[in-house]
Amino acid sequence: MKRLTGTNEKISNILYQEQLELSKENLDVEATVREIIEKVKEEGDEALRAYSEKFDHVVLSELHVSDQVVNEAFDKIDKDVLTALENAKANIESYHKQQLKGGFEDQPSQGVLRGQLIRPIERVGVYVPGGTAAYPSSVLMNVIPAKIAGVKEIIMITPPQEHFVPAILVAAKLAGVDKIYQVGGAQGIAALAYGTQTLPKVDKITGPGNIFVATAKKLVYGVVGIDMIAGPSEIGVIADSTANPVYVAADLLSQAEHDVHARAILVTNSAELADAVELEIEKQLQTLPRQAIARPSIENNGRIIIAQDVESMFELMNLVAPEHLEIAIDKAYDYLERVQNAGSIFLGHYTSEPIGDYYAGANHVLPTTATSRFSSALGVHDFVKRIQYTQYSKAAVNAAEKDITTLAYAEGLQAHARAIEVRNDKN
């Protein structure tokens, strides 16, 4: 891991530029994705079948995954995995149900009524990667908040495979997916955004994917809503001398194994801990099955910063605004209020980040690349709309006429003013 020195502002700028470099867009990819989107818009199902044969090497006779195939997955899944998914589902549901919020209504003055309605999005599409990147936990994290929000129809797409990963189909059934289609890549995102003869057009698309999927989501944004454009996974760990280097090293590697572009950042006020963590990382890498991914990730993108004190550690990490933030300090909860920017926080020596990935209930779809400065984890709020309503009586309009027309004339919008004036007592 590379060590950085300097002021917090200087270090945070270096880290941000490095992260942008890891997340930068590929213009060749964008050109390819634009072509795919246009083809799907023009040819619909025919284009989906052609791209499935080209990219996935699968000849599709049927795009829809039947209920029979889904139900058979329950016979094939490992029973311990099924139990774990059921328990994780319960935790995710109990957490996200607390995010439900109702509308409001008030009467600030005589004859004036104001309010806000909360309405679920009608139809949502969830993208689920296939192959070695098949993550049933992501199915739960994307679908359950939508279901709790009251989304009427949830469509899931996943790349076609000769044999589906049973846990993916089981997770979809447990979470409440209504229909599953075997289509992936940029072509799948295009199908969700514009609809085809078989796939219905959705109102919002969520879910992780490779650079082609992420680019497609970016290009269809505006036609549909999206959750976010996520960059490589990242973890920031604030640790002092009370931290266990074995735990810290394991947690840094838990993100490094995701992707060669993943980031792992340790900020500590203990040089001894920093040294011990580096030694422990090398030791743990020796037996890690995904060493081929984790080693280049940690060597190229891993960073250690020695801070002067606890205050400086939190100041720097707030500038970094990591996706995942672990606070490996005794009585970590006492430091919670010091955090201004983070996607999700993990408190104390025993709260490893994977607890949040799989089980605790808080969502694992999180803002990356310092976007936690202005955005949040996926939740129920992402699947609802807020609709305002207003009602004024004739007397209330007359009482407010002067202020409203004054503002309208000040902006040079005479028709706005007249729309109020025609309703006054003189008319």
Swiss-Prot record:
The active site is at E323 (proton acceptor), H324 (proton acceptor). Keywords: Amino-acid biosynthesis, Histidine biosynthesis, Metal-binding, NAD, Oxidoreductase, Zinc. GO terms for biological process: L-histidine biosynthetic process. It catalyses: L-histidinol + 2 NAD(+) + H2O = L-histidine + 2 NADH + 3 H(+). Its cofactor is Zn(2+). InterPro entries: Ald_DH/histidinol_DH, Histidinol_DH_CS, Histidinol_DH_monofunct, Hstdl_DH. CDD domains: Histidinol_dh. NAD(+) binds at Y127, Q187, N210. Disulfide bonds: none annotated. GO terms for molecular function: histidinol dehydrogenase activity; NAD binding; zinc ion binding. Its EC number is 1.1.1.23. Binds 1 zinc ion per subunit. GO terms for cellular component: cytosol. Substrate binds at S233, Q255, H258, H324, D357, E411, H416. Zn(2+) binds at Q255, H258, D357, H416. It holds the Pfam family Histidinol_dh. Pathway: Amino-acid biosynthesis; L-histidine biosynthesis; L-histidine from 5-phospho-alpha-D-ribose 1-diphosphate: step 9/9. HAMAP family: HisD. Belongs to the histidinol dehydrogenase family. Catalyzes the sequential NAD-dependent oxidations of L-histidinol to L-histidinaldehyde and then to L-histidine. NCBIfam families: hisD. This is Histidinol dehydrogenase. It comes from Streptococcus mutans serotype c (strain ATCC 700610 / UA159).
